[in-house]
């Protein structure tokens, strides 16, 4: 990742990067250090913003956007999982907006400009490294809503299976549940196209086949590579059926009262589906 990132940074001539992280695992496990060294090697000044919540809050987005403006940031680098990447997309949009970030969430058409985003993915899960959308929470209004814009596609995403080896088993499984949730909500629609159906079935088989392998041997890079492929394709539209999908995965956005608790997306989905089934 470091070598490829240094090449990208040099060719694009960025000057100041906001590096966004979550709870600290990327610092403990060494991924952040590699990114910081790549930025330093390319002559890019670094401003760090850490502590993104498990369900990113608009208050954090506003603070980070203000920091971008104050420091003259011209690049945002997300290091972590989907929630860090979601927050970073919102930060990219909010940095160029004359007003609170929540205005953009309520009306996505207000996104007129955005900072470029690079992502360094550390878990196979949401596929946020390869789409143009985010989900942001507002504790004050008790809402959790999507933000999407063509200006929010990452300019480049670095996806290295070695960066996922240190993910705990519990979080690993939660990520794979999230992957399957994305695909199943698209699979169970009326009149799904045969091409999309076949693609989704193949990806689901890949997740089912490789998950036990990774849990048995976390250092199996081949299995982790396959799971990262499955994650990356989940939300980028390649399997878009052009029909309304199931609501189970989307319903998690409505559980705003749960936002005070750091519960991963997929575990909420599983609980809700089980409740409906019993």
What is the predicted role of each segment?
Residues 3, 26-27, 124-127, 164-166, ...:
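Short, acidic Gly/Pro/Ser/Thr-rich loop/turn segments
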Residues 6, 33-36, 47, 62-65, ...:
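Predominant activation on well-ordered alpha-helical scaffold segments within soluble catalytic domains
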Residues 1-75:
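ATP/NTP phosphate-donor binding region
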Residues 133-236:
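Carboxylate- and glycine-rich phosphate/diphosphate-binding segment that chelates Mg2+/Mn2+
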Residues 59-162:
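Glycine/threonine-rich beta-strand-loop-alpha-helix active-site module
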Residues 233, 237-278:
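C-terminal charged capping/lid subdomain of soluble metabolic enzymes
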Residues 52-53, 79-81, 241:
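Active-site nucleophile and cofactor-binding loops and adjacent substrate-binding regions
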């Amino acid at each position: 990742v470091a070598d490829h990132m240094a090449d990208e940074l040099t060719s694009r001539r960025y000057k100041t990067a906001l590096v966004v992280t979550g709870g600290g695992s990327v610092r403990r496990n060494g991924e952040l250090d590699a990114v910081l060294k790549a930025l330093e090697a390319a002559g890019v000044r670094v401003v760090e913003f850490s502590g993104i919540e498990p369900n990113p809050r608009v208050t954090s987005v506003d603070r980070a956007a203000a920091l971008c403006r104050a420091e003259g940031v011209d690049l945002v680098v997300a290091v972590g999982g989907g929630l860090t990447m979601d927050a970073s997309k919102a930060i990219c949009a909010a940095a160029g907006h004359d007003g609170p970030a929540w205005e953009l969430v309520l009306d996505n058409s207000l996104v007129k400009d955005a900072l470029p985003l690079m992502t360094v993915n550390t878990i196979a899960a949401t596929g946020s490294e390869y789409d143009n959308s985010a989900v942001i929470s507002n504790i004050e209004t008790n809402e959790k809503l999507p933000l999407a814009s063509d200006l929010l596609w990452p300019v480049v995403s670095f996806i290295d299976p070695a960066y996922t080896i240190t993910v705990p088993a519990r979080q690993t499984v939660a990520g794979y549940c999230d992957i399957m949730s994305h695909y199943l909500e698209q699979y169970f629609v009326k009149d799904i196209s045969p091409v999309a159906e076949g693609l989704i079935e193949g990806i689901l088989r890949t997740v089912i086949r490789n998950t036990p392998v990774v849990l048995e041997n976390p250092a199996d890079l081949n299995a982790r590579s396959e799971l990262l492929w499955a994650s990356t394709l989940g939300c980028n539209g390649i399997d878009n059926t052009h029909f309304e999908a199931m609501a189970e995965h989307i319903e998690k956005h409505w559980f705003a009262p749960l936002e005070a608790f750091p519960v991963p997306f997929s575990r909420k989905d599983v609980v809700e589906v089980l409740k409906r089934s019993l």
